[in-house]
């Protein structure tokens, strides 16, 4: 986006190494330019194992691929914010303002930080998913979509944002059952628990390339 310190001194060099490794067919699992060598992909390096990043940085110049990914992330924020707003009953016009408001609520310096921006889509995605699940239709489909979003954020984004968004998703599901739908039967609790377990399981499976090496 712009040129703050984090991008200029950390992420541009990270992704220049990453892009060059992909284009030359060499391994990006060991970065010889950090210390005496360091497995950058294990840190919060914004998704060296993310298939979207692999495709972008294999095909494009590293600088252009970096900013293309940021633009894609911000588009997804706008898209899922609109869907979430509509699912919550807002008008089309009001829904179109939610994404920009959400983005502007962040420190603008973060908008060039891929670790942060790669996870910004998750909150509106999970709000949309929870709202659609609460409607009672296609519960398992939207739980699966939510799980895929959690996994993608774990794979390429900021762990703190991912955890916060996932916790909010769980609280929303429980509050929707108890306070809005007022369902207190044990079957309702089992259904909510199964929904959350499915979401979590899919998230872990999607994120396995990042999770397993870090264990």
What does each model-identified segment do?
Residues 76-88, 92-179, 192-214:
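Membrane-embedded helix bundles of polyisoprenyl
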Residues 188:
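Aromatic-residue-lined binding/catalytic grooves and analogous aromatic/hydrophobic interfacial grooves
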Residues 1-79, 100-121:
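Membrane-interface coil-to-helix junctions
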């Amino acid at each position: 986006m712009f040129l703050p310190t984090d991008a200029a001194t950390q992420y541009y060099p990270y992704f220049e190494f990453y892009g060059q490794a992909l284009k030359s067919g060499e391994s990006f699992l060991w970065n010889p330019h950090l210390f005496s060598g360091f497995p950058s992909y294990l840190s919060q390096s914004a998704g060296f194992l993310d298939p979207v990043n692999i495709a972008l940085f294999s095909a494009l110049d590293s600088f252009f691929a970096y900013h293309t990914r940021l633009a894609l992330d911000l588009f997804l924020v706008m898209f899922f914010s609109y869907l979430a707003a509509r699912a919550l009953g807002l008008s089309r016009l009001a829904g179109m303002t939610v994404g920009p408001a959400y983005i502007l609520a962040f420190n603008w310096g973060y908008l060039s930080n891929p670790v942060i921006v790669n996870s910004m889509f998750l909150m509106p995605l999970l709000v949309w998913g929870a709202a659609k699940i609460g409607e009672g239709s296609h519960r398992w489909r939207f739980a699966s979509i939510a799980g895929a979003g959690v996994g993608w954020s774990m794979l390429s984004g900021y762990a703190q944002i991912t955890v916060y968004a996932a916790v909010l998703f769980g609280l929303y599901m429980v509050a929707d059952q108890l306070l809005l739908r007022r369902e207190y039967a044990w079957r309702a609790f089992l259904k909510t628990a199964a929904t959350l377990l499915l979401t979590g399981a899919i998230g872990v499976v999607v994120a396995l390339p990042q999770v397993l090496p870090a264990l």
